[in-house]
Amino acid sequence: MTDQSGQRRVVIVGGGFAGLFAVRALRRSASVTLIDRAQHHVFQPLLYQCSTGIMSEGKIAAPLRDLLKKHKNVDCVMAEVSDFDVEGRRVIARRIGGKLIEFGYDDLIVAAGVRQSYFGHPEFARWAPGMKTISDALSIRRRVYGAFEMADTATDPEERRTYLTFALVGAGPTGVELAGQLREVATKTLRAEFRNIKPEDARVLLFDGGSAPLAMFGPKLSQKAASALDKLGVEQHMGSIVTHVDEGWILVRDHDGAETRYDVGTTLWTAGVEAPPIAKVLATATGAQQDRAGRILVEKNLTIPDHPEISVLGDMMSLDELPGVAEVAMQSGLYAGQRIRHRVSGKIEEKPFRYRDLGSAAYISRGKAVVSVGPLQVNGFLGWWIWLFIHIAFLTGVRNRIGALFTWWFAFTRDIRRERTFTTQQIETLRDVYTLPLGPDTATAALEPATGRHAATPETETGATPAAPQGHANVPSDPVQAAGKPQKTAE
């Protein structure tokens, strides 16, 4: 089947790295419809810099239409996919305003990414936001700087100490990077700006169920990271599991089973991810299997078994325990796009997807980062420069790269974080509705008939939230307070 121009129809769900690289690989060999519920592509590895005031959202995100304006074969659609008609080869999505529209396809690529996982406790999200979207980063920015403002006007010493205590759940790259940035905000950026408080007295608590931060980087770099965090003043609580999150406090169980309450003004969740609800919808429609995190199990060519026309890419796919990093998304997108292009040109033979590990990098603080590339392990100042180069190279758009360089120069040489504007009304802003579990209360009713090239379809039902993974290292699958366990309050 083809569209009116005679080209093969390809629908891509998701405008992240996987979706964009698939678009670029297809070139002009197909008519492409790219569907995303946001109208921008965001560089997620730098979201923590947006949340701590270094970067503006415009420097780490770019409009999809602008990025793809030279790709005349690509139509960008802002809508949220809600269902798949596999037999009829249709994608059903909800447009702005609530009406459903459909898109026919010959090949379907689903690269919808992942969302924050609370391991069976979505109620934690209200008091412990994750960081997967621009909305998340801006909400965290308001919470962080708002905490210092609230502490400045607090008259009760205990209340002031609570506002100046920050907890991070999860000591992977995002948790470590955020922890380091929060201490730099307190000890450098804000140090001379307040008269009633000492921002440098702010406590940053880092919790993880594992034995060390950045464990995935290996023992050597993990120890270097732990040492750098110690020097920054980050209080590391390894072997600790957060069992409850509420307004103003968290409950933590250590490796001995003792539970401790910590009074905290801000809790940030960086402990894990899971596939979005649309993965369950796709699995139900195709009969595909899902792993513990809800990701779709795919064949070696990244397609769903018995459905060679449907590819699942990036963080949403499950194959050979590949990590959820940008390089996997990029390479899988390039592979899937080339595979479809080869099929269009009549090339039948195809090779299985092979991931080339380009290494990992994590920023800790100014002049300190860890980088692991195969047998090469670098830390400290050299690692920091390598980190800068990698992230500049991966940023989308020349303007964003140049802007990032100037922003980093000001931030790193003059302790300036210009992106700190917010109002009192914004301090308590809750997280974006898309980051919360989908359900009847978040669904939008259809309001008006759709117009234009996309036909309206009857209302469809989104799938249930995928089952939470069990036995995660940072947070238990069922973190309930154990009866009879000793409980204490942190000093």
What are these regions (language model features)?
Residues 41-44, 117-120, 276-278:
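Short acidic/His/Gly/Ser-rich catalytic and metal-binding motifs that mark active-site loops
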Residues 71-90, 183-300, 306, 348:
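A Rossmann-like FAD-binding core segment of flavoenzymes
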Residues 2-78, 82-83, 166, 173-217, ...:
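Beta1-alpha1 glycine-rich phosphate/pyrophosphate-binding loop at the start
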Residues 1-7, 74-167, 257, 268:
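FAD-binding core/adjacent interface of flavoenzyme oxidoreductases
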Residues 6, 332, 338-491:
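C-terminal, flexible cofactor-proximal segment of oxidoreductases
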Residues 127-155, 249, 261-332:
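FAD-site-proximal beta/loop scaffold in flavoenzymes
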Residues 18, 113-116, 179, 273-275:
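Short glycine-rich anion-binding loops that position phosphate/pyrophosphate groups of nucleotides
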